[in-house]
């Protein structure tokens, strides 16, 4: 994450999407939320934001995916990010945002959070508000649990709501093949289904942890840079409820593993399915096989850096 004051009229910032290689969800809290423990990995699918000074706050979308159903009003997360930065710094102007989206929408990969992260960085540079890294991370946490990680990038452990970050060592590059669904899944619906599942099976499963933790095997696999080790410990507590709400994802998981994936996992709350491949050649072969099965497929590598200024 890099930021500096500028005299440019336009600032271009970029932030990555993410995969949760491990996601453990704690018990339902009184406020209706859950604490989590997750291992994030930033992957090379990017959201690009161009920020231009303006009197008010506005946003428009473009890019490789259909954005026609996205809101461009005050409730858009990128607009909220810009307004939050202006309010917290006393900046009296506005901004027009142009966002090119390449991270699947409502796919569990943090595309909206990447928009917000890139917007914070772009506006901080455009306006010369000169927030520190920690200040930007704190603002990001006000916007959503995944925003701080989109700012930080790399590989990290997220606790609390996922916004309290600790860097994690990760050696080498992991090869991912992403099967993109033609539909979205509501994150609140997936968490709600998880709570119902736990209530229905309270006699048969261990109680949810009050303070969830990432399994040590995940950290060891990341440190080793070994995709075979990581494949053995991929974990997502939200996968079962996501499969319940979207049963077709189970067929996608099976298809990927039948065509050479080391393992597959629903990314976050879904419905994107992330397959881990042994190496680049295996990833290419898997991409071809899934494409032949008429799935929309993207290949990506991780970890990659977090939000940064491209020009400005």
Swiss-Prot record:
Its EC number is 2.7.1.148. ATP binds at residues 104-114. GO terms for molecular function: 4-(cytidine 5'-diphospho)-2-C-methyl-D-erythritol kinase activity; ATP binding. Disulfide bonds: none annotated. It catalyses: 4-CDP-2-C-methyl-D-erythritol + ATP = 4-CDP-2-C-methyl-D-erythritol 2-phosphate + ADP + H(+). GO terms for biological process: isopentenyl diphosphate biosynthetic process, methylerythritol 4-phosphate pathway; terpenoid biosynthetic process. The active site is at 18, 146. InterPro entries: GHMP_kinase_C_dom, GHMP_kinase_C_sf, GHMP_kinase_N_dom, IspE, Ribosomal_Su5_D2-typ_SF, Ribsml_uS5_D2-typ_fold_subgr. Belongs to the GHMP kinase family. IspE subfamily. Catalyzes the phosphorylation of the position 2 hydroxy group of 4-diphosphocytidyl-2C-methyl-D-erythritol. HAMAP family: IspE. NCBIfam families: ispE, PRK03188.1. This is 4-diphosphocytidyl-2-C-methyl-D-erythritol kinase.
